[in-house]
């Protein structure tokens, strides 16, 4: 299957001139290019990197210490049950992402993804802070945890930065963003595990996970909402500038005005 898909990719038609005009060329970023992008979008990138740091740490703890977080023997779950839960979660996420791929407007997809991941993180917090009140079954709890975490994690590993580059017409590729996310996230995981072993090796994993999940969910939801507000403001500002330039160009062509005169006419 992998070989077949690889062969099919080689059969894709080359982009036409119209395709090149409608899209931004994906190029390899050098050091200067990476720094330029980071400085240009520093507020939103810091928020997203910060949020993904905690999401990756939380996800790794759930995956690596699941048998300590839940009582597997008491719940009666087998390894096949865990596989079925992950399979259902994967299908749900693929369905949602498939629908979003049909949306052509890049900004709408970015907004939808940020709202989606915010709902996911708030779900984590709600379950964590109301764990004893809800009294969810182990299967339901595990399904909701996996769905919320994987929705957030995979949103930024797949769709988000592709649409981000297209929306703001950035000459680059997603490799810089994804590698940075992974590096920060996994370094955070290592740091948490080292601190746990050095300062408090014997802990109640369920209490620790719920406490961390609750506060991480709130912090990440605030970060994602901040990112959404920033992106909307940035998009409107750049769109206004673009419209202004187009009007200036049309004025010059229609009336034969010089740039200086056209600017004067626009001000009036």
What would you call each of these model-derived segments?
Residues 54-62:
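Conserved extracellular-gate-facing transmembrane-helix segments in secondary transporters
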Residues 109-154:
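C-terminal transmembrane helical hairpin of 12-TM major facilitator-type secondary transporters
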Residues 168-198:
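A late C-terminal transmembrane helix in Major Facilitator Superfamily
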